[in-house]
Amino acid sequence: MTELFIDGAWVAGSGPVFASRNPGTDAIAWQGASASAADVERAVASARRAFAGWSALDFDARCEIVKRFAALLTERKEALAAAIGRETGKPLWEARTEVAAMAAKVAISIQAYHERTGEKRQDMADGVAVLRHRPHGVVAVFGPYNFPGHLPNGHIVPALIAGNTVVFKPSELAPGVARATVEVWHEAGLPAGVLNLVQGEKDTGIALANHRQIDGLFFTGSSDTGTLLHKQFGGRPEIVLALEMGGNNPLVIGAVEDIDAAVHHTIQSAFLSAGQRCTCARRIFVPQGAHGERFLARLVDVTSKITADVFDADPQPFMGAVISARAAAKLVDAQARLIEQGARPIIEMTQRDARLGFVNASIIDVTDVARLPDEEHFGPLAQIVRYARFDEAIERANDTAFGLSAGLLSDDAHAWEQFRRTIRAGIVNWNRPTNGASSAAPFGGTGRSGNHRPSAYYAADYCAYPMASVESTQLSLPASLSPGLHF
């Protein structure tokens, strides 16, 4: 089987065989050999050879290839959505939106290069000052499993537009989606070596991250893995390291007239994608008193009716399975540990089948947990924290090392002003779900949530470096010489 894409051709991997599974059925979704260290070496060497030609190619010519990629994505939307659903458990309705987002990033990325990078000129006394942007060279892109098409392309598209070449290491849990995406890139007309795919598990990732011939590493994934990468590159300032990681995101419920709207946005924040979005709300702050009780009762009522099913079920469910049976068991275990520390389950999470990734949307009151662990539970596990004062809610919301997203649901504009001034997060929403974001705005956080903004627009900032020039078309002796010089 040809699992890897190196130097413009599909080739067999020489590492251990691994497989991905449909988390809703346990059927094998993809199987093949991983990339060995030698395979990674060939992929990086291929990207290095291709860099000179690709970076020298006219910018508009590079953009035409990327635009063809977007057009092909639109043509193959259903097939790609099925691949995403089969491997991640994500319902088809949601997988279709992921493919659409992949295509939409292209136009924004091209616009971003012109507006944020590109070339700018300013006249000066003896010539002109010019700001240009140059690609870094060979960049490694590490993709996550939760959006295996959309999120890696948030790095790949702007990297290619800027003139870099890429070695792509997808999540070992979604290799089939990666292959399908790279096939589209190949058909779009990318020259050999410009994009290389290395499939594999931990050893493949280590071989790529440790390679001395990469100029940048762009990563979307867990904070633990991103932190290890950051430590690994300590003392190597020549490497451009862009990290987009997780969050322990707060959603604060304030004074609202429309309880159903607040409940809807809370469910979208906590349970969309089965809670497997880095921007999902993990901690929901609910006021004490009658208003909070009404909100919580309605939240429990609607949440209890949410079903999870296979990706292609008819009718479509709100949630699919989480990525694996192991991930489901880990969530149930996290709930058990919280209960041991004093939490009170309101809707208890259970794993439907030990072989599958199905868990129910769950709600647990952690108000009485003395030392609430600052962890990202990556799934539909909503933690309720009751608060007496709005200041207290903000203080506790900020009690995290993460800083990705935060939200306030409130009719009070003054409360919003206070919230946005004092909350510590990169994405802060008002009367919208915490996971609502635009590709034309910065996407990313602060603290343990990362150090760059890998949306289509702001990714341009780290995909090229600025080069400043002072230029004159005519070489001439200046009219005024420095003291001590005689001509």
Curated annotation (Swiss-Prot):
**Where does this protein hold NAD(+)?**
221-226
InterPro entries named among the record's database cross-references? Ald_DH/histidinol_DH, Ald_DH_C, Ald_DH_CS_CYS, Ald_DH_CS_GLU, Ald_DH_N, Aldehyde_DH_dom, SuccinylGlu_semiald_DH_AstD
Q: Spell out the reaction equation it catalyses.
A: N-succinyl-L-glutamate 5-semialdehyde + NAD(+) + H2O = N-succinyl-L-glutamate + NADH + 2 H(+)
Q: Which UniProt keywords apply?
A: Arginine metabolism, NAD, Oxidoreductase
* EC number(s) given by UniProt: 1.2.1.71
- What residues sit in the active site? 244, 278
The free-text function statement in the UniProt record for this protein reads: Catalyzes the NAD-dependent reduction of succinylglutamate semialdehyde into succinylglutamate.
NCBIfam families attached to this UniProt entry: arg_catab_astD, PRK09457.1
The protein's name is N-succinylglutamate 5-semialdehyde dehydrogenase
Q: Which organism is it from?
A: Burkholderia vietnamiensis (strain G4 / LMG 22486)
